[in-house]
């Protein structure tokens, strides 16, 4: 709840900063002659940004849950291996190799979380530069990026609430 409201404040700051930079194009050359940035739904790039932004929280959640499953499978295989190779574990005469299991789990978790970690960093860049290349307009690119951010904010709140209620978070 409060994180979602905080994110909405950040979106308002994004829109406010865009207006400021566009109005002061002489001071900020990248924004010179950018024109007005509109988040109107009549702009197809805004709609595309909303659709792409709505997808990202679900994609992130799906990839992250798959990563957890793969890491869990790796640890199950390690435990089975230790039971096979050290039959005294069940009898209490041998100790399991906890260090190897923890090391294996840590490596698997780090390896599996690379793509979900890159997704929030690379997706906004793809939106901005993709729209910029297609439309040739910085104003459309910034509008699509703003719509993307707004959709991510709204959908991530819903995904977080849903995952909390079903025990996935």
Curated annotation (Swiss-Prot):
It is found in: Cell inner membrane. Keywords: Cell inner membrane, Cell membrane, Hydrogen ion transport, Ion transport, Magnesium, Membrane, Translocase, Transmembrane, Transmembrane helix, Transport. GO terms for cellular component: plasma membrane. Its cofactor is Mg(2+). Its EC number is 7.1.3.1. The chain crosses the membrane at residues 45-65, 114-134, 141-161. It holds the Pfam family H_PPase. It catalyses: diphosphate + H2O + H(+)(in) = 2 phosphate + 2 H(+)(out). It is a multi-pass membrane protein. One of its GO terms (molecular function) is diphosphate hydrolysis-driven proton transmembrane transporter activity. The keyword Cell inner membrane applies. The keyword Membrane applies. Belongs to the H(+)-translocating pyrophosphatase (TC 3.A.10) family. Homodimer. Proton pump that utilizes the energy of pyrophosphate hydrolysis as the driving force for proton movement across the membrane. Generates a proton motive force. PANTHER family: K(+)-INSENSITIVE PYROPHOSPHATE-ENERGIZED PROTON PUMP. This is Pyrophosphate-energized proton pump 1. It comes from Rhizobium leguminosarum bv. trifolii. The gene is hppA1.
